[in-house]
Amino acid sequence: MADSSPAPSLRAGGPREPRPSAPSPPPPHSRLGSEAEEAELSLSLARTKTRSYGSTASVRAPLGAGVIERHVEHRVRAGDTLQGIALKYGVSMEQIKRANKLFTNDCIFLKKTLNIPVISEKPLLFNGLNSVDSPENETVDSFSHEEELVAAGEDVSPLSPQELDVQPMQPEEVSARDFLQRLDLQIKLSTQAAKKLKGESRDEEGLYTASLYHS
């Protein structure tokens, strides 16, 4: 009879090493997340607009603490230039263009007044609804008033040094003179009252002494 024993499953030379498995593909949800991030990044880059020459897009840098931007009204006159106005108020021509929506430098003559964005370091004080005028606003208003007088042909005569020295001293001199006069009057009244009281006391002592003598 033939041998019916099963053939050995292992060959001579020992067991066979397992083959390395191929890397598994990434799960679908991770690929979807990365694609969504890339799409969002591309949209954010597309929203960022580059500024071209003559653009009136209002792109403002964040102001620091205690720095504010206010607008000063400037009347356009014959002979004004955008560069001269910018140098006068200490701002750039692009800031004036953005504030007034101007496309070229010659467009300033299309407007009667221009809004000049002036940056100040002192914050404005508010009393509910209306703002309190700061000393800087008063300086700008007085300067514009003098310009209007000069443009109208009126001479603005500056004050002489003697007038500047005399004017603020007048209220102080009057108040000091009044104070000294009042002080002298009080001293006189006090002296008279003291003399009167002293005389009355002497009369009373004399009457008392006379009454004792007669008694």
From Swiss-Prot:
Region annotation Disordered: where it falls in the sequence: 1-40, 194-215
Span of domain LysM: 72-116
Gene coding for it: LYSMD2
Keyword match Methyltransferase: no
Organism of provenance: Bos taurus
Domain of life: Eukaryota
A Pfam family assignment: LysM
Modified sites of kind Phosphoserine: S5, S24, S34, S58
Positions bearing N-acetylalanine: A2
Bias type Pro residues, positions: 20-29
UniProt-listed InterPro entries: LYSM1-4, LysM_dom, LysM_dom_sf
Protein name: LysM and putative peptidoglycan-binding domain-containing protein 2
Keywords, alphabetical: Acetylation, Phosphoprotein
Keyword Cytoplasm included in the entry's annotation: no
